[in-house]
Amino acid sequence: MARGGASRRSFLKLAGAGVAGTALSAAASSYARIAGANDRVGVGIVGFSDRFRNSLAPAFLKSAGELNFEFVALSDIWSKRRDDGGAFVSKLPGGKQVALARNNEELYENKDVQAVIIATPDFQHASQGVEAVRAGRDAYIEKPLANTMEDARAIRTAVKGTDRVVAIGTQRRSSPIYQRIHDYMTSGTFGDLVSVELTWNVNQPGRWRRPKLVSQLHEADTDWKRFLTGRPPEPFDPRKYVEFRLFWPFSSGIPDQWMVQRIDTVQWFTGFPRPRSVVANGGIYHWRDGRKNWDTLTAVFDYGPIDEGLTGAAKGFQVVYTARMTNSAGGMREHYFSNGGMLDLEKGTVLPTGGLTEENAREMELKANQLTPITFAAPGSEEAAELGAPAERSERKSGAVTERSPAQAPASGTAAAAPTVSPLGENTGPDESTIANLRNWMECVQARKRPNSDIEAGYNHSVALCMTIAAMQTGQRVSFDDAKQEVVIGPPTGHVHFQQRSSRTDLPGGREP
């Protein structure tokens, strides 16, 4: 039991008296100041997923002993995953039996839970984050933070109304190697960014599919109404529950799962909080297996000073994001270009490739512009390996890894400390960025400081995500109304406000070829 538990109970009795979430948060913050950094922090697990099992749990354990954190409870609405999760945690190094909760209301009745890790389906992250901070808990929330602006505004408002420490799972912001590259990119040495090319190509018929797990899910074993979490009512569908990444409004698929991390990196490196405009095209071109989310996407972003509008020239640049699940040629690339050369983020190198040569500069009486080569990480080093999460590196080899999928715990008797394996057969495990991001959150929980990947970073990547989804759903160029914090169709002036499509028949994948 956490030291100071009796005091915490007295603070949290406010919840049973029906006190508003802000008052509860104020009481919890008072407790945090009294307890101090040396008191053990009890952590609740919200959602026993593959992302938690394969990456977050082992990453957490890297720092938990030193920083005095421990798992004390687990909440999952599906009885199978709840029981499997309890068994999994008990087999972790230093593990023990944790309290099991059927839902988050039960979880937050447990006074030993002082913070939570949320690793549930995409569309639940924001609302469950709101629940956490209103219950006076600190939270680590997996990416994406939100895929509707309504949810994004709700979690941002909730966090800003408290002093809860909330970190988002865009883990690159805590990685030393990415931080060094960020510092270089913001130093001015690279020159003005003119273009970014982001690519993610795989060929995986089983990507985000879970037919065996789907067959094990029965409505009586879960709480379908809670699963929907504010989405429109619809009949129970085990496939949408387990394979949610393939179906809007539970996920947009490629943008939710893959694009967010890279767009967050662009925004972090450049300081721009959001795109000025987004257009997108794509469809379901090959994997016609009942999914509604696209298997192929191209999205084009215009970035630059917001007050200059869509045609502003100063320091503006274009980002082209392409992804396909149908052919892996081209693999994964993140290339940043200036007039003087390029940053290959996957390799951690800056080269004068494509920069203005002496010959071409002389023609217009200009000076050559050739970047000085830099290698941020020695080839074969741990830092070189860090430039890309383990799941991404595994995909380059075999195209066989899945992230943040509904979890299947090891069979009884399986050693939890062994390397974890995804349902498609590849080792994943914690990457150094995730270890660093969780540690940063844990340290900030103790020190009551803002984490590297904070609520503003999460909100901003959610804006870019929602703009992309709107472009997919409408086929039009979209922008953003800063005054109303809404995605709009057309330019910021003379626009039409976008109405988020969330019914079962009005889907981003509806424009199938």
Predicted regions and their residues:
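Glycine-/small-residue-rich active-site loops that bind phosphorylated ligands and cofactors
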Residues: 51, 124, 146-147, 173-174, ...
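Immediate post-signal peptide segment of exported/extracytoplasmic ligand-binding proteins
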Residues: 36-40, 188, 192-193
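Contiguous beta-strand/loop segments that form the cofactor/metal-binding neighborhood of enzyme cores
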Residues: 180, 192, 197-201, 206-456, ...
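Rossmann-fold dehydrogenase core element
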Residues: 154-172, 181, 191-196
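N-terminal glycine-/serine-/threonine-rich beta1-alpha1-beta2 phosphate-ribose binding loop
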Residues: 1-138, 150-165
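Short basic (Lys/Arg) and small-residue
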Residues: 143
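Alpha-helical packing segments of well-folded alpha/beta enzyme cores
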Residues: 56, 81, 85, 128, ...
